[in-house]
Amino acid sequence: MRGLDYRWIEALDSVVSKGSFERAAEQLFISQSAVSQRIKQLEKYLAQPVLIREQPPRPTLVGKKLLGLYRRVCLIEQELVPELTNQEHVRPVSMSIATNADSLATWLLPALDKVMKSRQVELNLVIYGESRTLDKLKNGEVVGAISLEPQPITGCSAEYLGQMEYLCVASPEFYQKYFAKGVTPRSLIKAPAVSYDQYDELHNKFLWDYFAVPRDKVINHTVGSSEAFVRLALSGAAYCLIPRLQIISELESGALINMTPDFMLSYPIFWHHWQLETGVLLEISEAITAYAKSVLPQ
């Protein structure tokens, strides 16, 4: 019986990553019908569909598992072939990491700095909410993910990194305008705030846990940028929950005020990665865990 042909999975990967059969054919230098035939052969071999044929095409659950396998094999091949063939000029090892925006804005880039400068690596840092990054690892879309979840998924390990501490801050002018009589449920309802996106529950959790303010009572802008949070707070347009690590100098200079010094939101974050790591992926995991533990409260 014929085994699994990786050209079939390669075709699936191209269709999913490029978003169409036509662009996948261009990438693989074969006809569009040949791409379709390879995926049909894969589905016949597995006796189940691997692709949801809509625009853009999406992998089924089985398809996602196959893509995870394929990308692992590609990563191992990228690292192993130059070693076996003594090739000096090869393409960098390509890998994707899922991270939340706040980690990227504070400690993640310094953690990766040495590896990016010393190794032939092409990193794709994709941003998702902390509760969603692990889904990307499950689907095989990334080789590692920063997540709130302490439990590793099958075939992966989870390393504790530290605590992300969030302070509720505003400019002195904003504070005087909305909170001159104190930070109370009434004043919090009147003042405009900021959240990252529709999945961001951080602000709502803070207001409910400490002030019993329900989410439907809050004026809440949505801005998909951690750096923009700081700019909005500094401009006096809103108050925000911002990582302490991101605004140390602003707090020291008085440009921002910690509105609730008695209350702080803190939660643990974890680095999830494949168990069987080698080469540059192992170096990345070691760099992330070591640096995070040196700058994040433990």
From Swiss-Prot:
Residues 21-40 bind DNA. GO terms for molecular function: DNA binding; DNA-binding transcription factor activity. SUPFAM superfamilies: Periplasmic binding protein-like II, Winged helix' DNA-binding domain. Residues 4-60 form the HTH lysR-type domain. It comes from the Bacteria. GO terms for biological process: regulation of DNA-templated transcription. Coiled coil: none annotated. The keyword DNA-binding applies. Pfam families: HTH_1, LysR_substrate. Keywords: DNA-binding, Transcription, Transcription regulation. The keyword Transcription applies. Controls the transcription of genes involved in arginine and lysine metabolism. NCBIfam families: argP, PRK03635.1, PRK13348.1. Homodimer. Belongs to the LysR transcriptional regulatory family. This is HTH-type transcriptional regulator ArgP. It comes from Vibrio cholerae serotype O1 (strain ATCC 39315 / El Tor Inaba N16961).
